[in-house]
From Swiss-Prot:
Family the UniProt entry places it in: Belongs to the bacterial ribosomal protein bL31 family. Type B subfamily.
Domain of life: Bacteria
Species lineage: Bacteria, Pseudomonadati, Pseudomonadota, Gammaproteobacteria, Thiotrichales
Subunit organization: Part of the 50S ribosomal subunit.
Biological role: Binds the 23S rRNA.
A Gene Ontology term for the protein's cellular component: ribonucleoprotein complex
Pfam families assigned to the protein according to its UniProt record, in alphabetical order: Ribosomal_L31 (PF01197)
Protein name: Large ribosomal subunit protein bL31B
The species this protein was found in: Hydrogenovibrio crunogenus (strain DSM 25203 / XCL-2) (Thiomicrospira crunogena)
Keyword Oxidoreductase annotated: no
Length: 83
């Protein structure tokens, strides 16, 4: 392996913003914000995600509409659909 060309592989915590569930894993993701979280006495970078296995209908078995950016409402307004 050549030195200096590979991304850093560090421990990161992903947090599902709809359920609050946290997942500790390793990733090459860059630290985009200064958010950190402390788990088991150690501090990790925090990445917030909208959908994970804790909230996705396929994994939870529940049909629910996850729309954090208003896409569904925009579609309904555009095509005249009612709830």
């Amino acid at each position: 392996m050549q030195a200096g060309i590979h991304p850093e592989y560090n421990e990161v915590v992903f947090q599902d913003i709809s359920t609050g569930e946290t997942f500790l894993t390793r990733s090459t993701i860059e630290k985009t914000s200064g958010d950190t979280i402390t788990l088991d006495g150690k501090e990790y970078p925090l990445v917030r995600i909208e959908v994970s296995s804790a909230s996705h209908p396929f994994f939870t078995g529940k049909q629910s509409l996850v729309d954090t950016e208003g896409r569904v409402e925009k579609f309904r307004q555009k095509y005249g659909m009612r709830k």
